[in-house]
């Protein structure tokens, strides 16, 4: 009897802890009206983006008997990164893809590779504004090129392996002016509308607007994998085969959950380098030192996204050229440079690996870290300030970048590796989608919690100023109260 009472008390304690956890991390946040407005504003713009993504371009008819972008690797990646608007060939079909491509190119350009852009990036707010103008100009160019390629590809049947025409232009709109000018500029306008929504989310909502809209596209496309898996393994089966199908489906769900947990661990993992400040005194314990946190994956998910666009977009143009002007050379390239073919898979994996290392070194901003060390009289114990510190940090960041390069290469290429082994493409969840799902979710939750804490501190400071009097003087001069306050304060 006591055994069952103990089990019951443990179960009740478990659920009470879960309730307290949600109350602490989620419910309390919604009591903050300012934060609640930001969250609701973000959700509203996400709904607007999804709604616009269901509106097909004027003058076009989407053929419902084919899966839009089925069998084409570029458009599957394009649809995920762009925000999912390509499914219905909507007003926002291009999504944020042109803007992301331009932003990554400008990230490369702000290094020593392009000295004028590097000087602009170091010239303060004025230079930052000029870089933004250049980024938007590149976005317009990329959006126009991608719009023409997408329209021509979908209307000629080059978007899938069966050469089926996925989009039909209605007879009254089937004119060169409409195809080559009106439709492309509508898609370009849709891209800048999407950028506008993302900027509003960044400024007035929660999280990074670009990441939130990409996450929206992932959330839209992700359920289809589970539906396809259910139909594949369970479907209309009965008896023993049904049991085996249920087991396979459960294993599939568990495998996805394990991958998500692994990605979560790698996303939050960091290398802590202990720091010492001149004049503070040397601490005997490492745990008492401040530290420099370096992300285990400093480049994030951008290497996979950029490598995907870099490798697949030229192949999409090659596919379109082969439709217009067939030749043995273009046919061979289409056959062998697909991502699920050995040559294409190797090129894709090597691209992810090299871009990860480059972006990892670029995003770490080593020169800025060393400069701050010199200004604040900070040094790493056992390492001399100056060139030795810079060399030490470079070696650490390079090792982290190489490790994350292997990690991202496995995640990005595994989808096409399993496809090359014969697995159905509609059952293989993209590692890119899972990385985006996990990283954006964690970063958004952390930003919500940070805003909640900062607003609470601001509110507490205001209340302290208003109530400052004899009682607060007594509290400030009481050593015991002062010690408790310091111990419970938040360093911001």
Residue map of PLM features:
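N-terminal cationic and glycine-rich segments that engage phosphates or anionic surfaces
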Residues: 2-119, 126-492
